[in-house]
Swiss-Prot record:
A Gene Ontology biological process term: rRNA base methylation
Molecular function GO labels: rRNA (pseudouridine) methyltransferase activity; rRNA binding
Residue ranges, annotated region (Disordered): 1-62, 98-118
Subunit-structure text: Homodimer.
PANTHER family assigned to the protein according to its UniProt record, in alphabetical order: NEP1/MRA1 (PTHR12636), RIBOSOMAL RNA SMALL SUBUNIT METHYLTRANSFERASE NEP1 (PTHR12636:SF5)
Catalysed reactions, semicolon-separated: a pseudouridine in rRNA + S-adenosyl-L-methionine = an N(1)-methylpseudouridine in rRNA + S-adenosyl-L-homocysteine + H(+)
UniProt name for this protein: Ribosomal RNA small subunit methyltransferase mra1
Amino acid sequence: MPTYSKRKSRGSLEVSEKTNQPKFIKRSQSSETITSGETASELMQDEKEQSNGAVGSIEDEELQRLRENQASVEALSKKPESIDRELGVEALEIDNVVKSDEEKEDPNGASSKTVKARPLPAGSVHRVTTHMAPIPARSIGSHDTTTQRLIVVLDQACLEIYKVGKAKDAKYQLLNCDDHQGILKKLNRNIAQARPDITHQCLLTLLDSPLNKAGRLQVYIHTAKKVLIEVNPSVRIPRTFKRFSGLMVQLLHKLSIRSVNGNEKLLKVIKNPVTDYLPPNCRKATLSFDAPTVPPRKYLETLQPNQSVCIAIGAMAHGPDDFSDGWVDEKISISDYPLSASIACSKFLHSMEDFLGIV
């Protein structure tokens, strides 16, 4: 029988000298010579069977792997404690499980078996201690002389309404420097005198603070037109300036804003002066850049036990700081740098929270 040398290619077709039939020469890795005893059709059929067998073996391996995974999942579901051991999580003790392995009767008289509850991992349990429980914001009147708190007066606030439009379609709007530049120019007013956004920023900073939620903050607004407004600690100031403007227009027209669910007044216009609403033992100060600098925490440490403090902050772009000279005791500065009204409120808030231990 003639022999052929091994080729590098996978195989080739050659014509037999005896039968003149094409024969497929297949390369073998185990021998150096290849016999030509098989025809091309037989070899191609063998290759097809081998490929089908390889595919079948791969499918069998995949099925076997899926069966093993399913069996392991079923085993873990039957024994949940094994999952805790694998994750390294210690099971919590549950004392209020009632008859976990016994039968329990329901009110209708039927008996049913209780399902044993699986304890939660330790990391997913959030324990709330007593001091972390939120205290509802409450209004503290001037008659309360024992509760120590911070009183903030936003003085010279730019809250002024103006009738805009023609006679029939005229509407009242909150005067601001962005939308009413023509009106301000007509009234010969400075643009800095129409900045209600400063009051908006200060109210958001004050009323969102933990000090207010703990019931240790009281806020008053004294406008440039000598209108005094009392702010309820439970009020939620609108986040957008457009909605805040509409709320202020309604307040200055109706003189009060009531809550939807009750008769409680969230914002109301009260009579001057602001000192009528301060506790008798209150210490009063104004923030001024020209005054001696003292850190807010050190200033609070000079207070007497149960003594409240009232801080007057100018809610304006710029101007003199003599707006509260008639009723304050002193002027202080809390920074070596000029601060905005919102930042000044924030610094005093944080210092008062640290001083009272409010987290």
